A protein has these predicted regions:
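A contiguous pocket-lining binding segment that forms or flanks enzyme active sites
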Residues: 47
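Divalent metal-binding pocket/active-site signature
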Residues: 1-42, 52, 60, 81-85, ...
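Short amphipathic alpha-helices and their capping/turn segments at secondary-structure boundaries
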Residues: 57-67
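Short acidic capping loops at alpha-helix termini that bridge into adjacent secondary structure
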Residues: 22, 68-71, 106-108
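Mid-to-C-terminal alpha-helical segments outside catalytic/metal-binding sites
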Residues: 92-124
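Residue-level signal for inorganic ion chemistry
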Residues: 27, 75, 109
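Solvent-exposed polar/charged
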Residues: 18, 63-64, 100
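Short acidic/histidine-rich active-site segments
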Residues: 68-85
Length: 124
């Protein structure tokens, strides 16, 4: 399992992982939608966090990730610009957003994300 922060290098990273025989998680992905779609085709997962909900680009990216490729992460304590200390409650806001996006109950979304984590751990 590779967890990659591809900031300012999404296209290069997607090109490099093409043909990789393992599981790739793109952490806090911020690249183009074109490269996002290519990464999805390559089987990548995407870890999203509370800060991504705070920007138009972050929300646009989340809206383009299939629910079966979503993972949650905090990036704490390294996330900057927070007005308050990062707590586990921030995950609830992410689940609420995803629930609204996919028009699914929060419990269904939580089970889906948990299943995604389990699948990642079972893959090569």
């Amino acid at each position: 399992i590779l967890s990659i922060h591809s900031r300012s290098a999404a296209k290069k990273v997607v090109n490099m992982i093409n043909g990789f025989d393992g599981t790739v998680i793109l952490h806090w992905y911020s690249g183009s939608i074109t490269d996002l779609r290519r990464a999805i085709e390559l089987g990548c997962y995407f870890s999203i966090n509370h800060q991504m909900l705070q920007s138009t680009n972050g929300r646009n990216i989340i809206e383009n990730i299939p629910v079966d490729r979503l993972l949650l992460e905090s990036d704490a304590p390294f996330t900057k610009g927070l007005k308050e200390k990062y707590t586990i409650d921030f995950n609830d806001e992410i689940y609420e957003y995803i629930s609204g996006l996919y028009q699914q109950e929060i419990d269904v979304v939580k089970k889906r994300v948990k299943a995604n984590f389990a699948k990642v751990l079972k893959e090569k």
